[in-house]
Amino acid sequence: MEGEELETTGSLSEVFQPEVTMAVTGEPPKPAEEELEEEEEETSPEVIDTLSLLDVLRVSAIMEDIIDQLSILGYIIPVQYERRQSLSQKTSHEGAPMVPSTPKISASLIAKDKPVVSDSKQRGQDFFFKKATKQTTMTLETMRKIQNDRQYFSDVIANAMMEMQACGSFSSLLEALGKERDAKMNFHDVITREGKGRKQIKSLQKQLVDVKRERQMQVQNGNEYIAHLRDQLQEVKAKTNLENLYMKRNTELQVSQTQKKCNRAEELLLEEIEKLRLKTEEENRVHMEIEMFLRNQQQKLEEKLEFWMEKFDKDTEAKQNELNALKAAKASDLAHLQDLAKMIREYEQVIIEDRLEKEKTRKKLEQDDLELRSIVKLQAWWRGTVVRREIGSFKMPKKEKDDSKDAKGKEKDKRRGKK
């Protein structure tokens, strides 16, 4: 696979221009190289800014040439790819019936207890078949990878050319290179993991050989155990033959005994049948007598029923007459009750009017009493004020000055005390 990849990369490098070819194989970049690349990436914008129009035209022409060569290569490669695909299909059809035949052969050899094929021959055959299928799949994968890489490279160059023509820079190309660098680092990680996986596969193959040996020992022990079981089977067959003979004789005796029992039971059943026949005849006779008795009773009951039906009609007619009389009495009582209710309502109205009249007279008497008391109080107040103020004919006679002064002083004191 690695040789084919190198051949394809070499053919691509011959078609491309020497100024733009770049390798994607080799060891992963070291830390120092990564630092240099980061510095170049940091300084690249300055270089891009200083590109002249002539440099842009030159680089654009080179990129157009690269795109044309890649498109031509895309039209050339599919012919070889289809041929290899048809060859891989033929080899897969030829090798398909051979691969699954090995487990059938090994299974038949184990079943017949024949010597098994050696591990070295078996490994050689497996390696031969696996190698044929692996080569076909690897060629198909390689061609697919070449086509994908060509298309990706063509897209990157086209984007870079468009950016170069638009703004005179190629930052998309630098971004694509960074992505490829990351992909290469991941590829190397995958290779290291694949190496570890191969080592693990080798250890597992060794374990598989040990397991096969253990299985062969187990098969041998199983064959010995099968032989032992066959001997036991022969002994069991002999015992079962004796047991079958004994069971046959025993069953014959049981059949004869059961046959005798069945004959005896049949005789008993016949006697029982005869008894039951006599009993059924007697029951039929009794049934006929009971039927005659029941018919007589039915006739008597029908006569009684007719009597009671006539009596029922008469009683219902009498009760209906009583009911009509009660309804008439109820109607008259209802009219009388309505008259009484009307009279009671009139009396209630009279009583209510009398009570209202009494209430009015009581309120009027209370009002007259209240007015009389108010008038008496007002007259008493007026008389008191007239006497105190000496209004009209209620003036007091004049005395000496001293007496008048004393009286005035006393009146003032009284007024102050009242206040």
UniProtKB/Swiss-Prot annotation:
What's the short name of a Pfam family annotated to this entry? IQ
- What sequence ranges are listed for the domain IQ? 371-400
Q: Where is the composition biased (Acidic residues)?
A: 34-44
InterPro entries to which the protein is assigned, alphabetical: IQ_motif_EF-hand-BS (IPR000048), IQCG (IPR042618)
GO MF annotations for this entry?
calmodulin binding; Hsp70 protein binding
Region Disordered, annotated ranges: 1-47, 393-419
What subcellular locations does the record give?
Cytoplasm; Cell projection, Cilium, Flagellum; Cell projection, Cilium; Cytoplasm, Cytoskeleton
Gene Ontology cellular-component annotations: cytoplasm; cytosol; manchette; motile cilium; sperm flagellum
Listed GO biological process terms = cilium organization; sperm axoneme assembly; spermatid development
**Record keywords, A-Z:** Calmodulin-binding, Cell projection, Cilium, Cytoplasm, Cytoskeleton, Differentiation, Flagellum, Spermatogenesis
Coarsely, its chief localization is cytoplasm
Function of this protein? Component of the nexin-dynein regulatory complex (N-DRC), a key regulator of ciliary/flagellar motility which maintains the alignment and integrity of the distal axoneme and regulates microtubule sliding in motile axonemes. Binds calmodulin when cellular Ca(2+) levels are low and thereby contributes to the regulation of calcium and calmodulin-dependent protein kinase IV (CAMK4) activity; contributes to the regulation of CAMK4 signaling cascades. Required for normal axoneme assembly in sperm flagella, normal sperm tail formation and for male fertility.
Subunit structure, briefly? Component of the nexin-dynein regulatory complex (N-DRC). Interacts (via IQ domain) with CALM when calcium levels are low. Does not interact with CALM in the presence of Ca(2+). Interacts with the HSP70 proteins HSPA1L and HSPA8. May form a complex with CAMK4 and HSP70.
Q: What is known of its domains?
A: The IQ domain mediates interaction with calmodulin when cellular Ca(2+) levels are low.
The family annotation for this protein states:
Belongs to the DRC9 family.
Q: What is this protein called?
A: Dynein regulatory complex protein 9
